[in-house]
Amino acid sequence: MCIIFFKFDPRPVSKNAYRLILAANRDEFYSRPSKLADFWGNNNEILSGLDMEEGKEGGTWLGISTRGKLAALTNYLQPQLDWQARGRGELVTHFLTTDVDSLSYLKKVSMEGHLYNGFNLIAADLSTAKGDVICYYGNRGEPDPIVLTPGTYGLSNALLETPWRKLCFGKQLFLEAVERSQALPKDVLIASLLDVLNNEEAQLPDPAIEDQGGEYVQPMLSKYAAVCVRCPGYGTRTNTIILVDADGHVTFTERSMMDKDLSHWETRTYEFTLQS
């Protein structure tokens, strides 16, 4: 289970406003090996964490490049998985390394969507000169990707804006933090968004999660139904905040669990300006 909240306004009126505010949780088995967010050794334009699971090495769930390409992935909750399907993390990696625009890329992905287990993919081209474009495709929804209009969105392990109770609850908390964003110092805004991502209040009952997840989700429903998931050996292990201001200055903050220890976390921040 993962969750993403984001607000984008390609041309904010105020100089103090942000073009993009994104807050995301990665929920995964604590034992699954991965690298913390960093610029890639073989491509120092791209910043992301990396999956190091055998056979899935190099995939990722969220990343951004200095050229303004951004992508984020969530899995679609389904009771049965096809273990022969392609690894979904490659969808983000491929976009970050290609020169293809976000909509064209998602159109190509949509032609191959049947080769993967369920997923949702956000792809964006952030350009100070041309204006920002953010697109969405889910392979369990409509056949064609869509270009998103400016606004605030929530995405978990169903289709975009599916009203799971935890998504609605978290989105409201996110909106409250975002509404104060212009008046807050950047570090205070980041701290407020991290508080949103670490809210463990279960939003029950939620028939929508039960219906979609079936028997698979029943034993863990009370844990899955919170923005921040806490189960034995599985749960929220990475929080990521991405801010892009009116001038194209990016602040990328990642807070990650270390050594499978809930009491041990590391926070790292990267800042750069998008290539126009």
Curated annotation (Swiss-Prot):
Disease: Metabolic crises, recurrent, with rhabdomyolysis, cardiac arrhythmias, and neurodegeneration: An autosomal recessive disorder characterized by metabolic encephalomyopathic crises, hypoglycemia, hyperammonemia, episodic rhabdomyolysis, susceptibility to life-threatening cardiac tachyarrhythmias, developmental delay, intellectual disability, and mild diffuse cerebral atrophy.
Family: Belongs to the Tango2 family.
GO cellular component term, pick one: cytosol
Cellular compartments annotated: Cytoplasm; Mitochondrion; Golgi apparatus
InterPro entries tied to this protein: TANGO2
Protein name in the entry: Transport and Golgi organization protein 2 homolog
Main location: cytoplasm
Superkingdom of origin: Eukaryota
Biological process (GO), any one: Golgi organization
Summary of the function given for this chain in its UniProt record: May be involved in lipid homeostasis.
Keywords, ordered alphabetically: Cytoplasm, Disease variant, Golgi apparatus, Mitochondrion, Neurodegeneration
Variant or mutagenesis effect after changing T74P: In MECRCN; uncertain significance
